[in-house]
């Protein structure tokens, strides 16, 4: 697959330029970046928030300590490989449902009986109320004893590509019907109330409190979190992109030619990127989480705008203006799907995939090569060197 590419040795590994795309890459006059995994290393924030949220939900519900190791990182990445899990809330939701299907039927039945009495309460109230009744329904060491079986089931369920959240829910409902716990799973789905507004959704409330911490959570939602999480996992993030990289790209392309298209909110981006944001065209930064809050926090209303739909990329480019060839830098399946969709609207987009700072980096490198990415980079910091080589190439 890599035979179709010219390889360059750069810091962090090999960079690859698709030979058939050289002329198009020479014409690049603007760059739009994804954020997580490209500009920001979010492995210790978003991935950890998924696992800690699920751990909190099941430890609270059952009264049994659930080790984080029950949720392998591979399960999260298996979901993302499909290109349909851009929202980490979706991944959290689907893995939570999968875990519920792994619990004994006696516990599921007890849960259904409790769930009937929980209508109308907020997310936190429902979780606290259910846990006060369900504690003691499982042996204290249940997750320690059954952990390896549950882990195996999660891996098995995510082994084949699941298109998106809705496909996953459909698959789990079919499984529940076959195995005789369909009503219990439906009750659990209703209990989680996802997607819905923040105060009513256990998934988004718990996830965001772990991710943002108390101060940012209150700024975003306008009310205090109830889990007592003082420091959010966002504080463990690190900036990948260097100021030198952004300066070099600005010198190459000119002022105002860098844009941002991300699912995260502006507050979260500013917290981690800091002064690096000064290099971006302020009108060409699209934060989908901000748009979601303008829509009343409704996850279902924002879906037509999120990756792999091309809205954020097209909006960013429209604000840059006067573009003939735009490089979009991403790190996932949905990123190159997004570029393909954007090209059906306006055929000016090229894709660069970053692979090194990921679990299974070799797999991602091959995935980008299979997708015929115009450029494959270890990290975004290789981009200035690669572009200089491209723009200096003859013929």
Where are these regions (language model features)?
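Active-site neighborhood of HAD-like aspartate-dependent phosphohydrolases
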Residues: 2-74, 90-93
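Alpha-helix termini
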Residues: 22, 58-63, 102-104, 247-251, ...
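Conserved phosphoryl-transfer catalytic core
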Residues: 50-185
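Long, low-complexity, polar/charged, intrinsically disordered or flexibly structured peripheral segments
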Residues: 161-241, 248, 254-257, 262-265, ...
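Substrate-recognition "cap/lid" segment bordering the active-site pocket of phosphatases
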Residues: 218, 222-250, 257-327, 333-344
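Acidic, Mg2+-coordinating phosphoryl-transfer loop and its flanking beta/alpha structural elements
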Residues: 262, 274, 328-376
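Short acidic-hydrophobic, aromatic-tinged amphipathic segments that line or gate anion-handling sites
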Residues: 286, 374-383
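C-terminal helix of von Willebrand factor
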Residues: 380-395
């Amino acid at each position: 697959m890599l035979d179709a590419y010219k390889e360059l040795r750069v810091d962090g590994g090999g960079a690859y330029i698709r030979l058939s795309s050289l002329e198009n890459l020479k014409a690049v006059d603007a760059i739009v970046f994804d954020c997580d995994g490209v500009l920001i290393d979010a492995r210790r924030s978003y991935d950890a928030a998924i696992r800690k949220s699920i751990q909190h939900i099941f430890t609270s519900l059952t009264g049994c300590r659930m080790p984080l190791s029950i949720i392998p990182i591979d399960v999260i990445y298996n979901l993302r490989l499909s290109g349909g899990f851009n929202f980490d809330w979706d991944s959290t939701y689907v893995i939570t449902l999968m875990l519920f299907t792994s619990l004994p039927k006696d516990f599921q039945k007890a849960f259904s009986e409790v769930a009937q009495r929980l209508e109308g309460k907020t997310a936190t109230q429902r979780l606290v109320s259910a846990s006060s009744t369900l504690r003691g329904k499982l042996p204290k060491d249940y997750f320690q004893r059954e952990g390896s079986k549950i882990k195996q089931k999660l891996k098995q369920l995510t082994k084949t590509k699941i298109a998106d959240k809705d496909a996953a829910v459909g698959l789990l409902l079919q499984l529940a019907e076959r195995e005789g716990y369909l009503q219990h799973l439906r009750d659990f789905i209703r209990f989680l109330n996802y997607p819905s507004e923040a105060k009513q959704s256990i998934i988004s409330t718990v996830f965001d409190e772990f991710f943002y911490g108390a101060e940012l959570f209150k700024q975003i939602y306008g009310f205090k979190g109830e889990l007592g999480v003082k420091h959010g996992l966002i504080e463990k993030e690190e900036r990948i992109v260097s100021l030198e990289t952004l300066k070099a790209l600005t010198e190459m392309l000119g002022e105002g030619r860098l844009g941002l298209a991300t699912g995260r909110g502006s507050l979260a981006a500013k917290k981690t990127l800091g002064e690096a944001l000064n290099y971006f065209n302020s009108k060409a930064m699209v934060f989908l989480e901000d748009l979601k809050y303008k829509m009343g926090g409704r996850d279902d209303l924002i879906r037509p705008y999120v990756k792999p739909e091309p809205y954020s990329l097209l909006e960013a480019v429209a604000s840059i203006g006067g573009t003939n060839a735009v490089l979009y830098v991403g790190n996932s399946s949905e990123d190159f799907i997004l570029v393909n969709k954007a090209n059906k609207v306006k055929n000016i987009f090229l894709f660069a995939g970053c692979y090194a700072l990921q679990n299974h980096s070799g797999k991602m490198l091959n995935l980008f090569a299979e997708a015929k990415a115009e450029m494959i980079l270890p990290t975004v910091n290789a981009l200035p060197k690669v572009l200089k080589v491209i723009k200096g190439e003859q013929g």
